[in-house]
Amino acid sequence: MHPDAFTPEQLATPYGTETAGEVQDGYLKHYVPAKSKTFREPGAYHLRGEHRIAGGLGVATALMPVDALKAECRRFGATVGEYLTAAIAYGVYEEYTACNGAKRPVSIFVPVNLRPIFGTETSLNFFSNLTIILPLARRAVPFEDVMEAVKRQFAEKLTREEFEQKLAFTAGSEKNLIT
């Protein structure tokens, strides 16, 4: 890692001096058994592509000017996450469904850092995801409509209550002796 990635205070902190909050398991700390429910997502549209050797994973990357990206986000009144999610969904729609049509929705998993939502300082892995599900239409859909649908789902799903239910489901399986 590059030395500039850390603040002077972080570099001065000796290894092994973590606080209890930094090493606490956020999943178990915020586990509420009564909130458990089963999560079932509808079948999603599958992108087809070249098969990789030995089941390898393909990762697409892109570089873009941050100022231009932020300007686009402001134009739509969206966060960067909302804008990029809408752009990916719209790209899938434009590329694959305009010519073929599809019966299944576009489904995008968006990773979410749970630390600010639950107010925890754990340095352990503490994340979940929200699933944005967009039904596909057989007609042209403007980007603005996709953006509004994405923003609406972010507002509905990016809540503490939603993630408490997911944590109860996930951490519950860890506490279940049969699993």
Listing of model-derived features with the role each one plays in the protein:
Residues 61, 70, 93-179:
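Acyl-thioester-dependent acyl-group transfer interface
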Residues 6, 15, 27, 31, ...:
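Sequence-level detector for tyrosine residue identity
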